[in-house]
From Swiss-Prot:
It comes from Aeropyrum pernix (strain ATCC 700893 / DSM 11879 / JCM 9820 / NBRC 100138 / K1). SUPFAM superfamilies: Adenine nucleotide alpha hydrolases-like, Class I glutamine amidotransferase-like. GO terms for molecular function: ATP binding; GMP synthase activity. PANTHER family: GMP SYNTHASE [GLUTAMINE-HYDROLYZING], GMP SYNTHASE-RELATED. The active site is at C87, H173, E175. One of its GO terms (cellular component) is cytosol. Pfam families: GATase, GMP_synt_C, NAD_synthase. It catalyses: XMP + L-glutamine + ATP + H2O = GMP + L-glutamate + AMP + diphosphate + 2 H(+). This is GMP synthase [glutamine-hydrolyzing]. InterPro entries: Class_I_gatase-like, GATASE, GMP_synth_C, GMP_synth_GATase, GMP_synthase, GMPS_ATP_PPase_dom, NAD/GMP_synthase, Rossmann-like_a/b/a_fold. Pathway: Purine metabolism; GMP biosynthesis; GMP from XMP (L-Gln route): step 1/1. It comes from the Archaea. Keywords: ATP-binding, Glutamine amidotransferase, GMP biosynthesis, Ligase, Nucleotide-binding, Purine biosynthesis.
Length: 512
């Protein structure tokens, strides 16, 4: 890890809410390093608290009355440093300090207008009314005795409060981009925290290089490269750290999008990362035969990938594996205690625990946009920096149900059509991801004068900043029609094309 709370920063105590990592991300955007610790681990919390300049209590999915988090909140308050409670964290502060928390007279979800009653430090410089993002059934009905009520809404009589000039709570989510003046609220609080605003991930190449150099020592290492920005940046950092003792390895698992292998090899070679090529497509397909469960697919791909990689590393004599694991990978794999596993990430949960290689993950605590800043410093071409992410298991998780050669051929071609048309329309650089999914559904169609029965392809295109949340892209109707026409014309097995308009949450970006 490049940096920890060994130097002053903000600690985000995670109560299991979906936005805990957005809080950390927004604080980093304001120049202050932030880390997350689960509220379920009091030992980890106790160890981290003394090093924090300020603490944020995150949102959470439950009620403060059914929780066991009072002790965690008490530990934070005893620290005597600036505290900010958000949503659940706001209610928890009110509860442990003697306020009243109960069912809101008007549960609020989505955009809500907040009325400022007293600006205090937290709301300084904001208008008297503005829109915020709410998501709560419970509310603070009566503030703690010494608290000053800063704001209210129809469903939250104590929508914001201040105690002793250092403890604050807000019922809304300032970290969500739908909230007006959310950045200003966090900025005001950080001004009180006083932590140094020195978090500039783009300037941390040298620090990361030294960290890898120290970790690997004189040993040999392999870098698992996929051609994505994460694995490429991790490999470049390792290359700078240990030079010719790094061996980039590209495993062709037979699950790549159309033209991906050739494009990746060309780009990596331009960067001085000439990869060791391993063709293992038949091995992966054999292992995936009959496997339909998405989690099992990821585990199978991870297991076979590790086996192939270990064989390559053994031939090379390497002891270390450099991976491009980033923060959202860790989150979605449920690597934090108390969080539900959304899906096993190939980089995190798919690798066996008994793998012989020692893991080196220089980007484990960075978000995607921070990795892109590092990539710019390292001279990575823009076409790779802004290349849309491809899941580690590749097209295996873009085919619902068991994988066959026919299904891979269909989804590979459909995906290529989506990419070609989106990019021809000049929208490629404006979208986070755009791809095709071969669904498990079948539908009736018409070919000529005859009834046909074939596959349904789903098209997915989303806008996002950090992959933590995403919204469906509003693609032009003519573009969607053109994509559907091409897919059904060029792939006769497909009779229907649908467009996925679901946000994340509640869905994930990938279907599996």
């Amino acid at each position: 890890m490049a940096k920890t709370l060994d130097s002053p920063g903000v600690l985000v105590v995670d109560f299991g809410g979906q936005y805990a990592h957005l809080i950390a991300r927004r604080i980093r955007e304001l120049g202050v390093y932030s880390e997350i610790v689960p509220a379920t681990s009091l030992d980890a919390l106790g160890e981290a608290l003394p090093r924090a300049a300020g603490v944020v209590l995150s949102g959470g999915p439950g009620s403060v009355w059914g929780s066991r988090h009072d002790e965690a909140a008490a530990m934070v308050l005893q620290l005597g440093k600036p505290v900010l409670g958000i949503c659940y964290g706001h209610q928890l502060l009110a509860k442990v300090l003697g306020g009243e928390v109960g069912r809101s007279p008007l549960p609020e979800f989505g955009p809500t207008e907040v009325e400022v009653l007293d600006y205090g430090i937290l709301l300084n410089g904001l208008p008297s009314r503005f829109k915020v993002w709410m998501s709560h059934y419970d509310a603070v009905l009566r503030p703690p005795g010494e608290a000053k009520v800063l704001a209210r809404t129809p469903g939250s009589p104590v929508a914001a409060m201040e105690l002793w000039g250092r403890v604050f709570g807000v019922q809304w989510h300032p970290e969500v981009r739908h909230t007006q003046y959310g950045r200003e609220v966090l900025d005001n609080w950080l001004s009180l925290v006083g932590a140094p605003r020195t978090w500039r991930p783009g300037d941390m190449v040298s620090e990361l290089v030294e960290s890898v150099k120290k970790e690997v020592g004189d040993a040999l290492a392999v870098a698992a490269v996929s051609g994505g920005v994460d694995s490429t940046v991790a490999a470049l950092i390792a290359k700078k750290a240990i030079g010719s003792r790094l061996y980039p390895v590209f495993i062709d698992h037979g699950l790549h999008p159309e033209g991906e292998v050739e494009r990746v090899v060309k780009l990596l070679s331009r960067l001085g990362l000439e990869p060791v090529m391993v063709d293992a497509g038949e091995e992966f397909l054999a292992a995936l035969e009959g496997v339909g469960d998405p989690e099992e697919k990821r585990r199978v791909v991870g297991r076979v990938y590790a086996e192939v990689l270990e064989r390559a590393a053994r031939d090379i004599g390497a002891e270390y594996l450099v991976q491009g694991t980033i923060y959202p990978d860790v989150i979605e794999s449920g690597a934090r205690p108390g969080a539900d596993t959304i899906k096993t990430h190939h980089n995190v949960g798919g690798l066996p625990k008994d793998m012989r290689l020692k893991l080196v993950e220089p980007l484990r605590y960075f978000y995607k946009d921070e990795v892109r800043l590092l990539a710019e410093k390292l001279g990575v071409p823009r076409e790779l920096i802004w290349k849309q992410p491809v899941p580690g298991p590749g097209l295996a998780v873009r085919v619902e149900g068991p994988i066959t050669r026919e299904k891979l051929r269909i989804v590979r071609r459909a995906d290529a059509i989506v990419r070609e048309e989106v990019e021809a329309a000049g929208l490629g650089g404006k979208l986070w991801q755009y791809f095709a999914v071969l669904t498990a559904s079948m539908a009736t169609g018409v070919r000529g004068d005859s009834r046909s029965y074939g596959y349904v392809v789903a098209v997915r295109a989303v806008e996002s900043v950090d992959a933590m949340t995403a919204k469906p892209a509003e693609l032009p109707w003519w573009l969607l029609e053109r994509i559907a026409r091409r897919i059904t014309s060029e792939i006769p097995e497909v009779v229907r094309v649908v467009y996925d308009i679901t946000s994340k949450p509640p869905s994930t970006i990938e279907w599996e």
